[in-house]
Amino acid sequence: MSAHRIRARRITRRNVPLAERCSFRIGGAAQFWAEPRSCTQLRALIEEAQRARIPLSLIGGGSNVLIADEGVPGLMLSLRRFRSLHTQTQRDGSVLVHAGAGLPVAALLAFCAHHALRGLETFAGLPGSVGGAAYMNARCYGRAIADCFHSARTLVLHPVRSRAKELPEVRKNAQDKRGECLGLDGGPFTCSSFQTVFARAGDWGYKRSPFQSPHGVELHAGRRLILSLCVRLTPGNPAQIRKHMQEKIADRISKGQFRFPSAGSAFKNNPAFGKPSGILIEEAGLRGTSCGAAQVAPWHGNLIINTGNATAHQVRTLLRVVRQRVFETHGVWLEREIIFSGESVRMTSSSRDS
């Protein structure tokens, strides 16, 4: 299958701007972009891209991602059309809510409010998609997705055994010396099975889920793609549920989370550090620090904002400055929460930037 045939598919477009699809409003274009409408289309796109030796990546709601200024090579998949939503009432009175990975978190919350289902109120105002929230094990006001997670339907990218002993760099051409298609971890893969993943306590942690990958949005062998999420909720008082949601949204607004484009929290909190990352950053005197149009928010240390036409390079530089200054001040290295995507980001990232 040639790259031309990939482009020719009606659901695939070329050179699609990504800045407008991400909350940071930063980044170049996707070389190829597709929004499959079904699991069949998704599977076909992945397999065709593999045969054509085209790198693959997957983006959720774009609320936690920094796209490289040069854009993203290969085919970027979006599951924004996976928006199914239905419920199952259980014998114990609880309700299982099944939501497609591409459904906006706001739409899921509106559904829960309308049907008086309690358990997700603290996520009111959270940007992004259901799949992205599950992938990150999103945590808001002390409650995480893991607290109500029941199961997720996934597509598994199984590794394909290769005869090659040594594999060349695949970030540029995604193929080995024989032209064999490779996953971005250096091995070929195929999407040969669907799998339902159920809750297991050991698989989850602070901002950690069993779906996460060190490759970020890039697809590779062993990756499980979230197609839909199932959460267990309980019936509640509709007025109280709406009130709780409105309070959380108002609190987010008062904290300036929506004043400028951003990717949310820049760094994860670490209980071992004794203080939230935002406080450590502020104590290092970094509020308002800028690199071009990228700035540490003057009102919140753990928020990097785009004050105008910031570039991904400026954001990455500012992230490095913040980490270095916090280390010099407190002796700890902050862990980045923002996910990097794109060729130059992958090639320039190091453990010190993680």
UniProtKB/Swiss-Prot annotation:
GO terms for cellular component: cytosol. Pfam families: FAD_binding_4 (PF01565), MurB_C (PF02873). Keywords: Cell cycle, Cell division, Cell shape, Cell wall biogenesis/degradation, Cytoplasm, FAD, Flavoprotein, NADP, Oxidoreductase, Peptidoglycan synthesis. PROSITE patterns: FAD_PCMH. It comes from the Bacteria. Signal peptide: none annotated. Its EC number is 1.3.1.98. Residues 158-184 are annotated as: Insert. It is an enzyme of class 1 (oxidoreductase). It catalyses: UDP-N-acetyl-alpha-D-muramate + NADP(+) = UDP-N-acetyl-3-O-(1-carboxyvinyl)-alpha-D-glucosamine + NADPH + H(+). Its cofactor is FAD. Its main location: cytoplasm. One of its GO terms (molecular function) is FAD binding. One of its GO terms (biological process) is cell division. The active site is at 265 (proton donor), 337. The keyword Signal does not apply. Residues 26-236 form the FAD-binding PCMH-type domain. It is found in: Cytoplasm. Pathway: Cell wall biogenesis; peptidoglycan biosynthesis. Cell wall formation. Belongs to the MurB family. This is UDP-N-acetylenolpyruvoylglucosamine reductase. It comes from Treponema pallidum (strain Nichols). The gene is murB.
